[in-house]
């Protein structure tokens, strides 16, 4: 009996092994898929774009792709690509924002190496006007054309990254929104800038981005995220998180206040000509938003334009119209990921470079600059579909018979004679 029982148990074990072997033999594809899913979920070598980070994508408010693209006027002549030209190639590095002083000098611009520089004409060239910290040094911070690559990102917290610039035309002071050092100011002679706002409600301002100055002296500025700094801005877009804020600094009391919160990558900001409202861009949600400062709608927020791509800064011309810099364009595949966070979570965990994942979604970034009236009606659209002049755009300034175009990613400025003369 013992022998039979033992023999039966051995036979049973043999059948179990046979069953397992049979599954592996007859279902290799399923096994590979299962192992691949486990590998992707664990991402042991941090090969995916999120690189082993905690990643919590969420749905966010973005207008339907088809609705936006059907109503958006296109520049089929790609006039920006035709008429634009590159300026100061490899002499400026990531010139995000462009500003001109009360004497008409400029442009002034903030660079990826942490400096604010100004153009002094061909005889002098570019000179350093300001830095945002006394810790800045040429040895630690100056990397030339490499400043706009991720080689510089690990140095940004030390060197600073000046983004939005605005002159107070009455005092000649230049106000700076720096991604790491918050809101700062420097006098007409330049030098090391003085911090004004680094915290709000006792917590650090993690990603100051752009600003504008109200006639009463208040400074409105954007704080893009409470979770991610500029070096990690990529994750703000991927997750669709909305912890950004619109802030106001009050010079008499030296205090900073939260005006609006729960924003998805608040970016550029511009007061209206009569200063009854301000416009700001939400990059993640691809839209231009109005915040009322005066009148019956004071304190209310409304979307004035849904955009075909990802907006950066917004600037006003002398007529009170608004130029918006847009990195174009959205794709239907992006909408699928936005509406289905679980798919997005899997997609960006794939051990594939981000460049290839973006290409698979049909993304081909190029520049669109658009002029709006105060109600959000599109007045003009200029495109550079082949990226001849600019692939990633940050700001448009209409000054001295030109459109001056900045970029956070390239080592040049672009310009276009304006108004355009049609041949």
Predicted features, each with a name:
Residues 143-163, 168-173, 177-237, 241-244:
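Asp-box/WD-like beta-propeller blade repeats and closely related beta-sheet repeat scaffolds
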Residues 52-57, 221-241, 327-364, 415:
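Short, conserved, GDST-rich strand-edge loop motifs in beta-rich repeat architectures
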Residues 23-33, 42-73, 78-116, 387-394:
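Beta-strand-rich domains and repeat architectures in extracellular enzymes and scaffolds
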Residues 120-124, 187-191, 249-254, 292-297, ...:
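Short loop/turn segments that connect beta-strands within beta-propeller blades
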Residues 11, 65-73, 77, 102-145, ...:
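Beta-propeller domains
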Residues 101-104, 167-171, 213-216, 273-275, ...:
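Residue-level detector of Asp-centered blade-edge/turn motifs that repeat once per structural unit
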Residues 86-91, 130-133, 153-158, 196-203, ...:
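Surface loop/turn motifs at the tips and blade-to-blade linkers of beta-strand repeat domains
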